[in-house]
Curated annotation (Swiss-Prot):
Protein name: NADH-ubiquinone oxidoreductase chain 1
Catalyzed chemical reaction(s): a ubiquinone + NADH + 5 H(+)(in) = a ubiquinol + NAD(+) + 4 H(+)(out)
One GO cellular component term noted in the UniProt record for this chain: mitochondrial inner membrane
Main location: mitochondrion
Species this chain originates from: Sarcophilus harrisii
Amino acid sequence: MFTINLLLYIIPILLAVAFLTLIERKVLGYMQFRKGPNMVGPYGLLQPFADAVKLFTKEPLHPLTSSTSMFIIAPILALSIALTIWTPLPMPNTLLDLNLGLIFILSLSGLSVYSILWSGWASNSKYALIGALRAVAQTISYEVSLAIILLSIMLINGSFTLKTMSVTQENFWLIITTWPLAMMWYISTLAETNRAPFDLTEGESELVSGFNVEYAAGPFAMFFLAEYANIIAMNAITTILFLGPSLMPNLSHLNTMSFMTKTLLLTMTFLWVRASYPRFRYDQLMHLLWKNFLPMTLAMCLWFISLPIALSCIPPQM
């Protein structure tokens, strides 16, 4: 029974990731006035399965100078963390109802740094190591802004439980009242998932492919799956925090459809950003966080802390 539950949990996420790669290639294709993949199956719908078969049937090679055990563990850890992040998400029901769901998600996203660092270090390649160091610095930096934004949202929500967010947003979405936080959160999730225009970890012109340059076949596919699973998970969290998952007890299937639609639209925006914007320079990336986002998020957090205290001092009106 445990195995069946595990498969029912993992397979839909992996299928969503597989078709996200197809959607990305199609969207980028049409934005660049070309078709995208259209040969494998009708309209190219079987392309993800062809890619999976190709990657997982090739021989997984590793450099002679690499640290073998760490080199193998890194992609497994990356995919495991990416799949575990989904457990406390209410869609509309959770797999694991945690009281500290948001702290759990923040901790796991912090752990994902280790898989990147290990892969860069174990590859014993200067390109992989530079890519890994960039990724670690970027991820750790943007987690600061993500944590402060989450703290502000939790002050509004009054709980660290994700399920209560739908009750908090019963009358209106939080994106309406906290739109500066929502904008900073969305940009920070782009940086956290190493997506364009913050994809400095895989700057093709200087680092070839970044921290996974020495990976091939199955292990490379695991990193790929982990990256796209994180993208969908981050957009699902954005939907829960700012776009109020619907609360209709009698129409639970509509709740799920609404949640999926919002998440898909946010994910499509990720692809739109990739097609539209050039890559940031590294110093611009860091200045954006430390000189712009950090002061603004701290100011907003102090505002949400001080507002209830200030209002509680007002004497009751007759």
